[in-house]
Regions:
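Short helix-loop capping/hinge motifs at secondary-structure junctions, enriched
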Residues: 10-17, 86-96
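A ligand-binding cleft/hinge motif common to bilobed small-molecule-binding domains
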Residues: 44-63
Length: 167
């Protein structure tokens, strides 16, 4: 998730974006730590997965607010795949296909949405608890070059660490 976001931001804003982040001494924290620092006021703004905030709002009654930045958000898809039989220790394509079919069914998607994530079905009738409309997120999506994310990961990670990560 973090690497994909870094690649999307790099492609949209360029290396100067990371230099500017580093100059602001931003903190890099895990999701739960970032939320705790936001609630205590140690941080005034955090970049975090939507589902982390929605979960906290629903389960704990948190009053944390969240928004989509004017310049966009990065959508992180969750993939489902079936491994080729010759590459699989279990060689159970039928079970994999059954799981995939269930995940993509209305029932499977209802569990995804109950987990504070958005359905992959464009016509799914509900959003996660307190979530933004899926179309709104799609309309403001910052695209990720997934091939670049993989093939240039070492140099991009180094660029980010050199400019943003505090030593």
């Amino acid at each position: 998730t973090a690497m994909a976001t870094i690649v999307g931001l790099l492609d949209k804003f360029g290396e100067d974006y990371f230099v500017a982040l580093g100059n602001q001494n931003v903190m890099i924290e895990s999701g739960s730590s970032a939320l705790a620092k936001l609630e205590t006021g140690e941080c005034s703004v955090v970049m975090i997965l939507e589902e982390s905030v929605l979960k906290k709002r629903e389960e704990e009654g948190s009053t944390l607010e969240w928004f989509i930045p004017d310049d966009g958000n990065v959508l992180i898809p969750s993939t489902v795949m079936t491994v080729a039989p010759e590459k699989s220790a279990n060689n159970n394509v039928a079970a994999c296909e059954a799981i995939t079919d269930w995940l993509l069914s209305d029932e499977g998607q209802s569990y995804i949405v109950k987990g504070w994530m958005h359905s992959v079905l464009t016509d799914y009738p509900t959003e996660p608890y307190d979530g933004k409309p899926t179309q709104e997120l799609m309309d403001t999506n910052i695209e990720v070059d997934w091939e670049k994310c993989y093939t240039e990961r070492d140099s991009i990670r180094a660029l980010f660490q050199e400019n943003v990560t505090v030593e």
